[in-house]
């Protein structure tokens, strides 16, 4: 099955080189010089979220009444009227085309462990053989991709092809690679969830309702909503692309299947929080920039325990937004690594004998008044609230 370069004679050397490749092929030209770094630091607020249809953009692009109606839908889940959807669609299209987008896609998360997207252009033919750029509220709110080729978890027969994508207005649209990405849920004609986001959104709604009722019972009447929050810490390995190509198991499986261990592993634990190698630092710098453009709050970066292992940790966010951000993060990590002559491995256990890659979620609940319900308080009343919710979580888990 494997070719000669993946023979038993080659394996020990290849595994050693792959794991210990963090110091090879240093490309100093990828590291921004002092002047460029200073400029970047001064302009991060301007850069951050520059490719996101966020609240700032909505406020500037939408009429005041339409903006208020959309915010009401986002915050309270009220029905979105067609005239509001049309107004939002026009504003989205104008903003997207101003930023170079020519297409839009309903971006969803089927039960395949990867995201899915179908790109449609904004063009609409006119009677004189020309085209105009058009985008309607109906196209924004609902799509109809062929669902027959996506797994359904046994919910329905394979010939039942109809599936719908429904806009999730609580997760901001964004631009990537010249396309306007619209986060959506994916469900069947009769409402069965065909993705991983629909159950998440439904669980968030249920928890919001029940947690708010519980807070009212124990005397906290000011709370109107309870959101769940997540801050997924993404661990990963970086290996040299040329060494990666020598290992067919890495290429096909994303992990090693056979081979000898590296001569040095994590015994001394000197890699954890160690100084970043120039090539890795350059990669992390470019990754931060790409993530910040998409409004992903990448906060912390450091070496992990295993050789060639690293971690990126964002600031926590509302759960469905954080999940969307994590899907984007994993995709962008691989793309940026390729530009640096590296390969980013996201498998949970790519190498035997050293640490695998976990993803701490840092799940919690917070009220619309800014209180973390899993944060112990300083008074008996606050501690009572904390203990009630802590016990409820332990009971549920």
Residue ranges, per PLM feature:
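Short, Lys/Arg-enriched N-terminal segments with co-localized hydrophobic residues
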Residues: 20-39
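Short, intrinsically disordered, charge-balanced linker/junction segments flanking boundaries
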Residues: 35, 155-158, 396-397
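N-terminal flexible segment immediately upstream of the FAD-binding catalytic core
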Residues: 37-65, 179-180, 303-312
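Active-site core of metal-dependent hydrolases
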Residues: 45-160
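Basic polycationic patches enriched in arginine
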Residues: 9-10, 34
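Glycine-rich, acidic/polar active-site loops that bind/position phosphate-bearing ligands
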Residues: 161-346, 354-397
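Acidic, Ala/Val/Gly-enriched low-complexity intrinsically disordered segments
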Residues: 3-5, 14-18, 29-32
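N-terminal-biased segments
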Residues: 37-55, 81, 277-297
